Amino acid sequence: MKFTIIALCLALSLVGMTSSEKLLDRIRANSLENLSRLVPSLCLLPSGRGNCDSQILRYFYNATSHTCEVFLYSGCNGNGNNFDSLECCLKTCRLNKYRNNN
């Protein structure tokens, strides 16, 4: 009798884990879909220097030339078209450009 109850509990917990994993997968898929909607708008923004006094080398995606370009970020404000590295800028905006053109 104890074995049957333990087996039943184990089976129910496994079913619960599978359902939880499916829910997490669904949440991840929705997050990626929402991100892919957000990325194009970020990449279409002009470079946003901001209004502080620092001069930090950053990259923005120039939607006209379809390239990532260097700009000096002031350290505050600005906008989302602001990447720490050329690689990050290219991966975010160029990949999305090709996805939208197909």
UniProtKB/Swiss-Prot annotation:
Domain spans labelled BPTI/Kunitz inhibitor: 43-93
Keyword Ubl conjugation: no
Expression sites by tissue: Expressed by the mammary gland.
Localization per record: Secreted
A GO term, aspect molecular function: serine-type endopeptidase inhibitor activity
PTM remark: N-glycosylated.
UniProt signal peptide: 1-20
GO terms (BP aspect): lactation
Site (Reactive bond): D53, S54
UniProt entry tagged with the keyword Thylakoid: no
PROSITE patterns linked: BPTI_KUNITZ_1, BPTI_KUNITZ_2
Principal place of residence: secreted
GO cellular component: extracellular space
Disulfide bond residue pairs: C43-C93, C52-C76, C68-C89
Glycan attachment positions: N34, N62
Keywords: Disulfide bond, Glycoprotein, Lactation, Milk protein, Protease inhibitor, Secreted, Serine protease inhibitor, Signal
PANTHER family: COLOSTRUM TRYPSIN INHIBITOR (PTHR10083:SF380), KUNITZ-TYPE PROTEASE INHIBITOR-RELATED (PTHR10083)
Protein name per the record: Early lactation protein
Organism: Trichosurus vulpecula
Higher taxonomy: Eukaryota, Metazoa, Chordata, Craniata, Vertebrata
